A protein has these predicted regions:
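Generic hydrophobic transmembrane alpha-helix motif, especially the helices
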Residues: 53, 63, 97-98, 103-152, ...
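Short helix-to-coil transition segments within interhelical loops
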Residues: 56-61, 98-99, 169-179, 183-188, ...
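Membrane-cytosol interface at the C-terminal ends of specific transmembrane alpha-helices
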Residues: 82-83, 90, 94, 132-183, ...
Length: 276
């Protein structure tokens, strides 16, 4: 029975396979891409063919090559932003969960206030402060504005764990916050962190795509899936459906696969259903 319960469904297997293929292909973009990401040619707005499997855009650039290189940027920013937001949420949520009630209310009140503000506006404001956009600045802007919901999940888990006998004993023996976090709290809320971290990767990629579509993402010379969609705004008017359809399918498919993987993590730990 347990083996059947833990067996991955076909949807999850397909998601893992898709993410593996996308990740490896993006990582090996310099080896797999038939052309440079910004290399122009005479074939303008050419439909998918033997020379250009995914077609070309209005500047004669190979779409397959740009998707491969764009995947590196989108996945990199998604992973970096998720790591930043997860780190902030772990510390913030743990402190809130272990603090006195009035401190906990104040910290969660601030998190709720931040959560009520449109993330995209805060990211744009931070980008204006950082100046020139780049992988690090975008990841920081998205990461420091995407931790609030995750912090509340972790806080709820910590409040539950803190009442256990072993945590109470560790506190009575003078155990530091860092020791209790490392030895007792982290193993207890790790499943919740894993679910939230996986979900935040997709959210960060979506935010980056939105910024790039608005022209507020990476510089023009850098390619991301969001910038590909931004460049394809006039594609349908010229009948070049592949310029918007193929990158859109790749981005949406990747986001769905990440969401399915996160859902599998949530289902794998039934205790998370009450807090998520």
């Amino acid at each position: 029975m347990n083996k059947k319960k833990n067996r991955l469904g076909p949807g999850v297997r397909l998601s893992i396979t898709l993410l593996t293929v996308v990740g490896i292909a993006s990582l090996l973009a310099p080896l797999l891409a038939p052309y440079g990401p910004n290399e122009m040619g005479p074939a303008i707005n050419q439909a998918p063919s033997a020379d250009h499997l995914f077609g070309t855009d209005s500047m004669g650039r190979d779409l397959l090559s740009r998707i491969l290189y764009g995947g590196r940027a989108s996945l990199c920013i998604g992973l970096m932003a998720a790591a930043i937001s997860t780190g902030i949420a772990m510390v913030y949520g743990s402190i809130s969960g272990m603090s006195r009630r009035w401190v906990d209310r104040g910290l969660m009140g601030f998190a709720d206030l931040m959560l009520s503000e449109p993330q995209i506006l805060i990211v744009v404001f931070l980008q204006a402060i950082f100046g020139k956009s780049g992988y690090l600045s975008l990841s920081l802007s998205i990461g420091v504005t995407g931790w609030m919901a995750m912090a509340r999940i972790i806080r709820n888990e910590v409040r539950r764990i803190r009442e256990t006998d072993y945590v109470t004993a560790a506190r009575m023996m003078g155990g530091s916050f860092g020791y209790i976090l490392r030895k007792h709290l982290l193993p207890g809320f790790l499943p919740a962190v894993l679910y939230a971290a996986v979900s935040s990767i997709g959210a960060a990629m979506m935010t980056e795509a939105t910024l790039s579509f608005m022209g507020l993402g990476l510089p023009v010379a850098e390619v991301s899936w969001g910038s590909l969609l931004s460049d394809s705004q006039n594609a349908l008017l010229s009948g070049s459906w592949w310029i918007i359809l193929i990158p859109g399918i790749v981005l949406i498919g990747t986001l769905i696969a990440i969401a399915a993987l996160g859902e599998q993590v949530r289902k794998g730990n039934t205790r998370l259903h009450s807090n998520l």
